[in-house]
């Protein structure tokens, strides 16, 4: 399986997560979920011990934005992909936000409707 897919093109550089930045970068395109092997768990990092903990801080999913490319979306740690949702199904993100750091787009949301 290909580890990384084409990342979405960045339109401009801006700071901080916002709904406006998400709308600016996606131009109203409806994303499609790429289920693959499911949501990937991201664990908290203990700066003092310099190691990862057993605490899940977030999960990541991949979504395809037709005409734009593939984007990783950060979800809350307790997020689960809804049962019955098929690969490449159109999804609606709950409270999506985006930010641009060094021309790289980061997207987060609270869930999927």
Per-region residue spans from a language model:
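OB-fold and OB-like single-stranded nucleic-acid-recognition modules
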Residues: 1-113
């Amino acid at each position: 399986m290909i580890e990384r897919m084409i990342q979405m093109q960045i339109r401009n550089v801006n700071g901080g997560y916002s709904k406006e930045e998400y709308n600016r970068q996606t131009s109203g395109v409806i994303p499609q979920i790429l289920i693959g092997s499911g949501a990937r768990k991201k664990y908290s990092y203990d700066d003092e011990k310099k190691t990862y903990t057993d605490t899940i801080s977030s999960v990541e999913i991949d979504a395809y934005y037709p005409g734009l490319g593939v984007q990783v979306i950060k979800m809350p740690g307790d997020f689960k992909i809804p049962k019955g949702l098929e690969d490449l199904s159109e999804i609606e993100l709950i409270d999506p936000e985006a930010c641009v750091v060094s021309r790289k787009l980061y997207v987060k949301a609270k869930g999927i409707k």
